[in-house]
Amino acid sequence: AVIAVESARKHASVPVAATLTFMKNPRGFFTIMGDDPALTIRKLEAAGADIVGANCTIASAEMVELARALRGMTELPILCQPNAGQPRLSAGRPVYDQTPEDFALDALELFSIGVNAVGGCCGTTPRFIEEIAARMTQH
């Protein structure tokens, strides 16, 4: 991710967002390569990222927990793109059980703790984003 940010900085004059995939273990969150999030965020900042965040692997409720930690690690805008729950196989295909309504509630929580942008990753559909937008207009 650091090399990608540095390259984008060199070759384009647009804002650069870098999101990473995290997993949770008993010691907390780490990238899928085992890297500490605070160190990784500092490296992305030093490389010139304008926006940092997390995507994929974890469901929206876990993303809220991770985002709280990330908010304490950086002043940069944060982008979060959680999965629609954890997948399970049904007839050989992944199925995500989280509803757009539950996902949107977690998205509102993400915004309330200082996340600047929320999207969706695996298992989400346009309906998930529509539900977030609908709930945002109610607040």
PLM-predicted stretches and their roles:
Residues 1-139:
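Domain-level signal for soluble alpha/beta catalytic cores
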